[in-house]
């Protein structure tokens, strides 16, 4: 019982870190949101996929050039160490930290909100340049947390419309929604989520029946983003 209690407390703590992080990323500018990379990752064909456990796999290693989105700044980088991952489980991965260690040093990657069958391109947290995957023999997924209840878009109550840098949130429930409505979104194109980061934007104070509220979503773009889940009271 003590072990289970400890695991629940750790999961809550990790989740708190996630939501604090995505809250900070909400305040970045629209200009940064529009600087999506047009350079596809260069995958090293010599590497094999890695089973990290619980249905999470590294499916590729390689280098990435383009906008560095992991810290929300979206400045341009060249030749950064990247990995591609896939969730083959039946649950959405809420958060996890992938660590690769070995003779080449330590490479760190973070991932959040990866749904079943979802694929993501993750960039090394310290912007390490990629040379080879051979020097990273130990590969682990740490602090993994899966959603206990699968997240939804609250589609029976909320309708979401997107513009570059903005989101339109409509109450379609026919009743007043008390409390905040929070929209979580990620970079997405060509079948991949780009970056482990999840952004959020919130409607504060609830919504009247039929009310439409436009909110700032600095990293959202019509062509390069997708809403992954919504929380509503």
What are these regions (language model features)?
Residues 91-99, 178-182, 196:
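Short, hydrophobic/aromatic beta-strand segments
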Residues 37-58, 124-165, 209, 217-233:
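Terminal connector regions
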């Amino acid at each position: 019982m003590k072990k289970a209690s400890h695991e629940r407390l750790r999961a809550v703590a990790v989740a708190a870190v996630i939501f604090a992080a995505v809250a900070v990323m909400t305040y970045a500018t629209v200009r940064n949101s529009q600087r999506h990379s047009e350079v596809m990752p260069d995958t090293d064909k010599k590497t094999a996929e890695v089973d990290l456990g619980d249905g999470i796999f590294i499916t590729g290693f390689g280098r990435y050039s383009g906008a560095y989105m992991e810290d929300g700044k979206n400045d341009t980088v060249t030749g950064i160490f990247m990995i591609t991952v896939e969730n083959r489980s039946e649950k959405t991965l809420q958060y996890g930290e992938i660590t690769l260690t070995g003779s080449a040093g330590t490479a760190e990657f973070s991932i959040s909100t990866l749904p079943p069958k979802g694929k993501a391109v993750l960039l090394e947290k310290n912007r390490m340049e990629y040379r080879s995957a051979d020097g990273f023999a130990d590969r682990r997924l740490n602090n993994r947390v899966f959603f206990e209840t699968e997240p939804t878009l609250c589609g029976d109550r909320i309708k979401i419309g997107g513009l570059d840098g903005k989101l339109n949130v409509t109450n379609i429930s026919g009743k007043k929604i008390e409390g905040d409505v929070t929209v979580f979104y990620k970079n997405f194109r060509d079948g991949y989520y780009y970056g482990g980061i999840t952004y959020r934007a919130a409607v504060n104070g609830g919504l009247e029946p039929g009310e439409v509220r436009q909110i700032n979503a600095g990293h959202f773009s019509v062509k390069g983003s997708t809403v992954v889940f919504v929380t509503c009271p």
